[in-house]
């Protein structure tokens, strides 16, 4: 193992039994109480962060992202973190705060991000997107859950320990996750020594419900592209030439339809399929959570978890053609679409994009010319969630939530997890979060369930205690 691969205290996790006392259960009760005590101030801090329109994808609001980074740095300083840095490698500002590990104790890296998605159509929000508003036990606003609540979770857990947890804690708050983390790999390389840890907690996922926590054990990857179809060198009168000469939009529609079979399964050859966790996901839950209209059926074959977490998915997310209000009786010469593909755990995003490209190039109807422009790639990730660190996490969930956590997959992508795994191959990675099925992250009326915030913060505080005190913890 090279020096770059060695966590700061990997031996400490292996020999903790000889160095640290067993958990004091009475102390754990005190810790739960202290989380409740700090939550009101943490919520105020969260609301202040939500009021900052930290949308890195909007160049006009990039100064707000810098203001958000300054606010996060101050919160970390006020909580008792030292060695606070605002860092950048040509992209958005990220914030790092460190609390050194006691002798023999492991170091835990806590990740979140302070940038948010654009808010979309203001008229579709029930309250202003950047003015946090509570309704029915939920806090509404852009970033309340994704992922400024991740920052709040870390702050609450750290403050509950009085700023002196029994482990080293490094908080890393990224500023461009919603834009695909384009400079993260450079940040990890530049800050490798600063960010090195034995355990990495990524608080950017969701939970099974508001009453049942999840430990995310797999995520699909992402590959996208733009396909352009051309049939003519100029538009033609549809009355004079329609029925003889193909138009590009009709060719594009037929090409896109070839991506799925009649049951909605992906019909592209050469794609990988994994095996999903054995979790009960009844159809009525799916309909309730997605807003599927009456009479509209599901697509694909296999269980819901298998289709959501372990099979590839292809979605057409945009089409460029003549808008209806500017349409005329013309055969359209060119049309294009953007295609997003989810890659099952164990697959390779680049290979899947190549397979999709081959399909598009070989299935064009009527000899239409097809040009495929590759886009973003993000690798899938599967976590081997076994061993003492994961046992400690499940115990912390169980104590904080009062029920067993669900090992769940996520159909979406967090590509940077693979980057963390590559940068710190010996670290154990835990993917947690504060979202729930009603959160509506990335959509209008995003919200945070305040009870989930309390339980997530409590679980993280308990986890820090267990990692620092339980003689059973070992890598």
Where are these regions (language model features)?
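A short core secondary-structure module
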Residues: 186, 242-264
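Histidine/acidic-residue-rich, glycine-tolerant segments that coordinate divalent metal ions
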Residues: 165-246
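Short, Lys/Arg-enriched N-terminal segments with co-localized hydrophobic residues
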Residues: 18-27
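N-terminal helical capping/dimerization or prosegment-like subdomains
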Residues: 27-122, 334, 338
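Active-site metal-coordination/substrate-binding segment of hydrolases
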Residues: 105-173, 455
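An extended, acidic, His-containing surface patch that forms the Zn2+-binding/catalytic region
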Residues: 78, 209-210, 265-326, 330-334, ...
């Amino acid at each position: 193992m090279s020096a770059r691969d060695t966590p700061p205290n990997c031996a400490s996790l292996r020999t903790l039994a000889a160095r640290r006392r067993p958990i004091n259960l009475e102390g754990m009760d005190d810790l739960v109480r202290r989380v409740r005590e700090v939550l009101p101030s943490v919520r105020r801090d969260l609301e202040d962060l939500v009021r900052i329109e930290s949308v890195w994808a909007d160049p006009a609001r990039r100064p707000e992202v810098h203001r958000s980074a300054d606010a996060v740095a101050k919160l970390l300083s006020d909580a008792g973190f030292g060695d606070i840095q605002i860092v950048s490698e040509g992209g958005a500002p990220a914030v790092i705060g460190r609390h050194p590990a006691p002798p023999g104790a492991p170091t835990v890296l806590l990740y979140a991000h302070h940038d948010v998605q654009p808010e979309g159509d203001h008229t579709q929000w029930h309250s202003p997107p950047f003015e946090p508003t509570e309704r029915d036990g939920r806090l509404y606003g852009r970033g309340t859950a994704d992922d400024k609540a991740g920052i709040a979770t870390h702050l609450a857990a750290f403050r509950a320990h009085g700023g002196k947890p029994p482990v080293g804690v490094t908080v890393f708050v990224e500023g461009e996750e919603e834009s695909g983390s384009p400079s993260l790999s450079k940040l990890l390389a530049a800050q490798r020594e600063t960010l090195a840890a034995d355990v990495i907690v990524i608080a950017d996922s969701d939970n099974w419900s508001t009453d049942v926590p999840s430990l995310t054990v797999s995520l699909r990857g992402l590959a996208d592209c733009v396909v352009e179809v051309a049939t003519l060198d100029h538009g033609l009168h549809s009355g004079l030439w329609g029925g003889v000469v193909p138009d590009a939009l009709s060719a594009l529609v037929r090409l896109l339809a070839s991506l799925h079979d009649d049951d909605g399964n992906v019909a592209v050859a050469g794609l990988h399929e994994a095996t999903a966790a054995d979790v009960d996901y009844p159809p009525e839950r799916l309909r309730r959570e997605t807003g599927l209209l009456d009479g509209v059926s599901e697509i694909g074959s296999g269980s819901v978890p298998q289709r959501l977490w372990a099979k590839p998915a292809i979605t057409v997310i945009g089409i460029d053609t003549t808008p209806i209000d500017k349409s005329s009786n013309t055969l359209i010469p060119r049309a294009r679409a953007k295609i997003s593909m989810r890659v099952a755990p164990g697959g390779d995003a680049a290979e899947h994009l190549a397979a999709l490209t081959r399909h598009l190039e070989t299935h064009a109807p009527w000899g239409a010319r097809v040009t495929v422009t590759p886009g973003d790639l993000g690798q899938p990730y599967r976590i081997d969630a076994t061993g003492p660190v994961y046992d400690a996490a499940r115990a912390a969930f169980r104590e904080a939530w009062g029920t067993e956590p669900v090992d769940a997959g996520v159909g979406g992508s967090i590509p940077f997890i693979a980057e963390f795994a590559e940068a710190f191959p010996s670290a154990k990675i835990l993917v947690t979060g504060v979202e729930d099925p009603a959160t509506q992250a990335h959509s209008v009326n995003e919200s945070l369930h305040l009870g989930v915030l309390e339980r997530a913060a409590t679980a993280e505080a308990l986890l820090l205690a267990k990692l620092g005190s339980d003689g059973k913890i070992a890598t």
